[in-house]
Structure formats: C-alpha cells, structure tokens
C-alpha cells in the first residue's frame, strides 16, 4: 500500500491536534482538579429521595398481578398467567413468550 505524502502529512497534523486537545484538557484538570469535572458536578447534585425509574418499574412489574385487559405499569406488556410480561420481539420474545 502506498500512501501519498499529503495523506501522511494530514494524518500527522490530525494526530498532533488530538494530542494538543488532550493536553489542554489535562492541563485544565491539573489546575482546577475535580472542580471542572462533569462527573464530580453530577455527584454533588442532591440525591432524589424517590426510587429511580428502573427500580420503580421493576417493583411494579414484579409485584403486580394483572388481568388481560389491564395496563401493567404503563408498559403495555402482555399479561401471562396473571403476571405482567414485557413485550419482547423476535426469536427471543417468541421463546420467552412460549415458556411463560
């Protein structure tokens, strides 16, 4: 494979640009520490006292008995044997639906 001189030059320039940007980010981090870090800002936010959506949804699905005409937890799942079962498409959904 032959590379033209222009493509090699562009690759070197882009690589140097990436190193410069990473160096600037690292320099900013070294000066300000975690104060400039977005993750640190997210950690400092107050914790919501309510359960996260996935936990609430899981509790609802696992603890709720349904009837065929009921809307289980707002998921519009399938009601199988009195339990809310989320709709899963494809081969996996067919296998899981057949098992339940």
UniProtKB/Swiss-Prot annotation:
Residues that make up the propeptide removed upon maturation: 24-55
Expressed in which tissues: Expressed by the venom gland.
Superkingdom to which the source organism belongs: Eukaryota
CC per GO annotation: extracellular region
GO molecular function: calcium channel regulator activity; sodium channel inhibitor activity; toxin activity
SUPFAM superfamilies documented for this protein: omega toxin-like
Protein localization: Secreted
Family: Belongs to the neurotoxin 15 family. 02 (omega-actx) subfamily.
Task of the protein: Potent inhibitor of insect, but not mammalian, voltage-gated calcium channels (Cav).
Name under which the protein is recorded: Omega-hexatoxin-Asp2a
